Amino acid sequence: MSAQTGSAAAIGDKGKGKSAAEPQDVTMGEGGDDSSSEEEVDDDAPPPAEEVEEEASDNEIDKSNIIQGRRTRGKQIDFAAAAKDLPADDDEDEDDDFQSEGEEDDEMGGN
């Protein structure tokens, strides 16, 4: 009978419903009360909220960049008149290497 109770105890320890083992206290190195680990800073961590607020307050908005009264909503814009005020584009320089579909390409022609 002792063989049966031994195997029953082994089966009872196995299986579902087993509670988790007690957590063990694991300390790294000597003297777990070192404050050096608390002083180490993670380079990828975001800065504390206090520093972020200081940086944001240092960057003031330049008032000269704010445009007053330049709303265009609902206004009729004459694009033809606006185009006359702009200087002409120098498109001739950009068209030098353009070839239309009708032209043959000597470099790629197989025959």
UniProtKB/Swiss-Prot annotation:
Subcellular localization: Nucleus
Cited Pfam families: CHZ
InterPro entries the record matches: Histone_chaperone_domain_CHZ
Predominant cellular place of this UniProt entry's protein: nucleus
Compositionally biased residues, Acidic residues: 31-59, 88-111
Top-level lineage group: Eukaryota
One CC-aspect GO term: nucleus
Keywords annotated in UniProt: Chaperone, Nucleus
Region (Disordered): 1-111
Entry keyword annotation includes Lipid biosynthesis: no
Entry keyword annotation includes Chaperone: yes
Described function: Forms a chaperone-bound H2A.Z-H2B complex that acts as a source for SWR1 complex-dependent H2A to H2A.Z histone replacement in chromatin.
Family the entry assigns: Belongs to the CHZ1 family.
Subunit field text: Forms a heterotrimer with H2A.Z-H2B, stabilizing the association of the histone dimer. Also, with a lower affinity, forms a heterotrimer with H2A-H2B.
Name this polypeptide is given: Histone H2A.Z-specific chaperone chz1
